[in-house]
């Protein structure tokens, strides 16, 4: 079945599109964009003028929680929520139980994502075993299993030598390292950005230098 969307505004930065275009869909597949093509027999849908038609969004920081924390989220529910909001691809952090620091967990996540058959899922492996910041994960194994990047998610890698090795190995496999830049010894028990407003509210401040030092490193 063919459907013709008449769009008041279509945006596709990759193709330099930003304006009023028609979009022809054939059996769920986008087949043609423009305004001069054969759409005979197609169902015509006028897209509301305040809507924007664009390619699916990508979320690079998602907590799917499965395996191990299904009471918070599952791959099924997380990917369903993603596509409902227009996100057709997501990268999931390794904060699972067990942590995604080996091929077995990565393959489990990908199998579950295939079974859910909704958003595309790109696993992010852990920098360190168990995200404990002590022993480097097998980055080659994670890459081979399907990880697209490495990160210890919300845990900063305090060991500078471990981070250096992670960067060196990740570079060999052309994998980004997503770092949580925060020096916990400087953060202390702060709960708000250090400054006038934190002081006025009586809140312990978080100094900006706690993040800046980790970035500079």
What is each model feature region?
Residues 136-217:
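Histidine/acidic residue-rich metal-binding segments in metalloenzymes
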Residues 1-41:
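N-terminal metal-binding scaffold of metallo-dependent hydrolase/deaminase domains
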Residues 77-100, 117-129, 143-158, 174-182:
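Divalent metal-dependent hydrolysis catalytic cores, especially in the metallo-beta-lactamase
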Residues 37-53:
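Active-site metal-binding motif and surrounding structural segment of the metallo-beta-lactamase
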Residues 60-73, 94-96, 122-135, 202-209:
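Active-site mouth loops of central-metabolism enzymes
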Residues 71-79, 131-141, 217:
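Short, acidic/polar
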Residues 8, 23, 28, 50, ...:
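Divalent metal-coordination and catalytic microenvironments
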Residues 51-113:
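Metal-associated gating/positioning segment near the N- to mid-region
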């Amino acid at each position: 079945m063919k459907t013709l969307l008449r769009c008041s505004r279509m945006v596709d930065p990759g193709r330099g599109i930003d304006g009023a275009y028609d979009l022809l869909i054939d059996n769920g597949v986008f087949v043609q964009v423009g305004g001069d093509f054969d759409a005979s027999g197609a169902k015509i849908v006028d897209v509301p003028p305040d809507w924007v038609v664009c390619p699916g969004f990508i979320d690079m920081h998602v907590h799917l929680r499965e395996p191990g924390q299904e009471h918070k989220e599952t791959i099924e529910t997380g990917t369903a929520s993603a596509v409902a909001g227009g996100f057709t691809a997501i990268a999931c952090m390794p904060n699972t139980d067990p942590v995604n620091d080996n091929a077995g967990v990565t393959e489990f996540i990908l199998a579950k994502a295939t079974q859910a058959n909704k958003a595309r899922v790109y696993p992010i492996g852990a920098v360190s075993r168990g995200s404990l910041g002590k022993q480097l994960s097998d980055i080659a194994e994670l890459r081979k299993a399907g990880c697209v990047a490495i990160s210890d998610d919300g845990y900063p890698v305090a060991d500078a030598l471990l981070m250096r090795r992670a960067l060196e190995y990740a570079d060999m496999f052309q994998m980004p390292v997503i770092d949580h830049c925060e020096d916990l010894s400087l953060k202390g028990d702060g709960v708000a950005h250090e400054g006038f407003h934190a002081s006025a509210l009586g809140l312990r401040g978080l100094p900006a230098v706690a993040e800046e030092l980790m970035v500079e490193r």
